[in-house]
């Protein structure tokens, strides 16, 4: 074994510089952070050859006391902390005291600084870590530092530097992050003698965003904020129309420090998930202000990462703030259309003294009387049953809006018959003949054996209690113009034109219904006339085995049929008549691409998304009643604005928008 050597100061400084100073932009970052800590309000950055030849920082901060000028370049010399405990309550950008020592050891560095209480300043020049001179000088209050010939004495590092253009771009990027993090500071970047970036320090974050990006982005932002006991989350997120195919327009600041965090990015993107199309990434500038003792910034040499004490709580806070803001913005955009005050949801007890005359109203019953499923019917007086169904006296009928995906685009409202009086006698007192008559009457309509029709012959009861969703003013000022290409529904309401993608809207309604059924463990399955046998590869079969409970809870009845063969006997009723094999393989492939740690909720959502996509039909010609039903079902959703894949379900044109298009107004 070789002898252990103690490295000299010059060597250790160069090694340390390799960690702290990766490229010229690292020098800019460290020096600008020092200026910010010094309370500067105007910071100028000058660079030449991408910072490889020259980096010059001028600030109007507090400056450095003459007695401290020399000490500032010693390793681990800092004014930010005094003990190890201070590391866990840091409120400054820098704290290690490594930057100046590292930079000066691999470059030629000149620094001039003056504090307000002195009439003159001090100037120091260091070359390769060695002090060449220290003298008095005349200068303004603040600090000016020049770093030239970076890595001149470390040829190995010079070989790995990128082009001047690439380094200039990296410096521009970090300056832009500073502009976003500190709207109250004016930054000026000069590249080769020409002004490249300029901010004005107005203190307005939107002004900073406009300076860094452009007018279009600054006009398509959604503000959000959330304040808890130890944390505040706030900032701006971009509307879906300014999303990008990469994450370059995403900025995270923790206590004003620009950081990169996968879990914070995941929280924002998950909040955005249902509002964006696949492979699109949202624009956002997010600020997290938290007590310093709840984070650790000393986990990376460049301080570009932080750790939180409670990442789960942080994730939820960020998710809720962003998701709520997006939902609120979309809701506000369609306020006139989705005005829930127009839909009067109430319990109406109607006292009817004469027969009700109804035009063949469909009541969808989600059970089959031939099965063992139970239907609970209670009444005070059970009278004779006519050839059709006789409404039982004092029976309560509670309507419940749902969607059933049968051969028609929509079926009528599902009704649930419930207790009108808990003390009433059970219908079991009826004899079996009565049950037989009920069953026959329910099956009279051959088109749908599960549909109960009420007409004027079966409403002789004196009183009916009905709980219903009934449009109040919703349709009064709404005009259904029609369909375009059997795909888009055109609606006029309150002098605004709404265009609804009927398939995206239908898919969203089905998705929410199916997801709700899965969550409530109430997925209705349909038995296939001919079971579908699928041969799987060993890998595919293993994925199925890992997720068979997911399939079961989603309404699939699957049995093993041989070594790597499965037999599908039942599928969710909501699917209608799907291509079972293709759907199953799509779901299996989707689960395969998921990480094993993904929660069952995410897997259920993936299944629901694929299932509903297969259930939506294309190019359907809808009647006015079907359009109204679709709108009613959209109205009760929490988020009717996007389909499960993130595409919008509708767009809106105001009269002003159209007049602008036709050049009637400017």
From Swiss-Prot:
Q: Is Transmembrane helix included in the keywords of this UniProt record?
A: no
Name one matching Pfam family: DNA_mis_repair
Q: Which GO terms describe its molecular function?
A: ATP binding; ATP hydrolysis activity; ATP-dependent DNA damage sensor activity; mismatched DNA binding
Q: Which family does it belong to?
A: Belongs to the DNA mismatch repair MutL/HexB family.
Task: Work out whether the entry's keyword set contains S-adenosyl-L-methionine.
Answer: no
- Specify the species: Clostridium botulinum (strain Langeland / NCTC 10281 / Type F)
Report what the protein is called. Answer: DNA mismatch repair protein MutL
Q: Which GO terms describe its biological process?
A: mismatch repair
UniProt cross-references to PANTHER family, sorted A to Z: DNA MISMATCH REPAIR PROTEIN MLH, PMS, MUTL, DNA MISMATCH REPAIR PROTEIN MLH1
Q: Which GO terms describe its cellular component?
A: mismatch repair complex
Output the PROSITE patterns linked to this UniProt entry: DNA_MISMATCH_REPAIR_1 (PS00058)
What InterPro entries does UniProt report for this protein, alphabetically?
A: DNA_mismatch_repair_CS, DNA_mismatch_repair_MutL, DNA_mismatch_S5_2-like, HATPase_C_sf, MutL/Mlh/PMS, MutL/Mlh/Pms-like, MutL_C, MutL_C_dimsub
Q: What keywords would UniProt list here?
A: DNA damage, DNA repair
Protein purpose: This protein is involved in the repair of mismatches in DNA. It is required for dam-dependent methyl-directed DNA mismatch repair. May act as a 'molecular matchmaker', a protein that promotes the formation of a stable complex between two or more DNA-binding proteins in an ATP-dependent manner without itself being part of a final effector complex.
């Amino acid at each position: 074994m070789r002898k252990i050597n103690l490295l000299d100061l010059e060597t250790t400084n160069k090694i340390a510089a390799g960690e702290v100073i990766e490229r010229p932009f690292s020098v800019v970052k460290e020096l600008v952070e020092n200026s910010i800590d010094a309370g500067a309000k105007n910071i100028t950055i000058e660079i030449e050859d991408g910072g490889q030849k020259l980096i010059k920082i001028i600030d109007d901060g507090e400056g450095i006391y003459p007695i401290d000028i020399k000490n500032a370049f010693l390793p681990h010399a800092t004014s930010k902390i005094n003990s190890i405990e201070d590391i866990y309550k840091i409120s400054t950008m820098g704290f290690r005291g490594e930057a100046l020592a590292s930079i000066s050891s691999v470059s030629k560095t000149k620094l001039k600084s003056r504090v307000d209480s002195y009439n003159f300043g001090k100037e120091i020049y260091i070359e390769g870590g060695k002090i060449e001179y220290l003298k008095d000088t005349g200068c303004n209050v603040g600090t000016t530092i020049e770093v030239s010939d970076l890595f001149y004495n470390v040829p190995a590092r010079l070989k790995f530097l990128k082009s001047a253009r690439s380094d200039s771009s990296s410096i521009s990027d970090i300056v832009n992050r500073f502009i976003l993090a500190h709207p109250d500071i004016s930054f000026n970047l000069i590249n080769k003698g020409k002004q490249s970036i300029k901010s004005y320090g107005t203190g307005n974050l939107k002004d900073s965003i406009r300076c860094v990006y452009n007018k279009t982005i600054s006009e398509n932002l959604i503000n959000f904020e959330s304040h808890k006991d130890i944390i505040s989350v706030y900032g701006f997120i971009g509307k879906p129309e300014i999303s990008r195919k990469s994450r370059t327009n995403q900025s995270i600041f923790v206590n004003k420090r620009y950081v990169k965090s996968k879990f914070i990015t995941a929280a924002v993107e998950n909040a955005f998930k249902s509002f964006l199309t696949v492979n699109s990434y949202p624009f956002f500038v997010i600020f997290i202000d938290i007590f310093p003792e709840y984070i650790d910034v000393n986990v990376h040499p460049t301080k570009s990462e932080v750790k939180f004490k409670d990442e789960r709580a942080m994730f939820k806070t960020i998710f809720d703030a962003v998701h709520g803001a997006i939902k609120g913005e979309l809701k506000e955009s369609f306020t006139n259309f989705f005005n829930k005050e127009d839909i009067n949801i109430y319990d109406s007890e109607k006292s009817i003294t004469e027969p009700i005359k109804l035009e063949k109203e469909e009541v969808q019953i989600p059970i089959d009387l031939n099965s063992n499923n139970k239907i609970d019917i209670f009444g005070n007086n059970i009278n004779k049953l006519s050839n059709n169904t006789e409404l039982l006296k004092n029976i309560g009928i509670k309507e419940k809006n749902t969607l059933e995906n049968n051969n028609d685009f929509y079926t009528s409202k599902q009704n649930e018959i419930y207790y009108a009086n808990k003390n009433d006698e059970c219908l079991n007192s009826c004899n079996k003949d009565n049950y037989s008559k009920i069953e026959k009457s329910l099956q009279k309509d051959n088109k749908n054996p599960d549909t109960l029709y009420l007409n004027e012959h079966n409403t002789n009861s004196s009183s009916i209690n009905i709980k219903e969703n009934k449009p109040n003013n919703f349709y009064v000022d709404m005009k259904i113009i029609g369909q375009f290409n059997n795909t888009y529904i055109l609606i006029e309401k309150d002098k605004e034109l709404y265009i609804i993608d009927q398939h995206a809207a239908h898919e969203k309604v089905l998705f929410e219904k199916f997801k709700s059924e899965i969550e409530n463990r109430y997925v209705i399955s349909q038995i296939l006339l001919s079971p579908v046998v699928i041969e799987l590869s060993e890998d595919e079969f293993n994925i199925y085995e890992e997720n068979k409970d997911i399939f079961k809870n989603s309404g699939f009845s699957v049995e093993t049929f041989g070594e790597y063969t499965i037999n599908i006997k039942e599928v969710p009723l909501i699917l209608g008549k799907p291509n079972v094999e293709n759907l199953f393989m799509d779901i299996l492939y989707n689960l395969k691409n998921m990480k094993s740690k993904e929660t069952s909720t995410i897997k259920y959502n993936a299944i629901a998304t694929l299932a509903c996509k297969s259930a939506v039909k294309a190019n359907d010609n809808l009647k006015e009643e079907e359009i109204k039903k679709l709108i009613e079902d959209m109205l009760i959703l929490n988020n009717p604005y996007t389909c499960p894949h993130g595409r919008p379900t509708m767009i809106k044109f105001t009269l002003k928008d159209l007049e602008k298009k036709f050049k009637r107004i400017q």
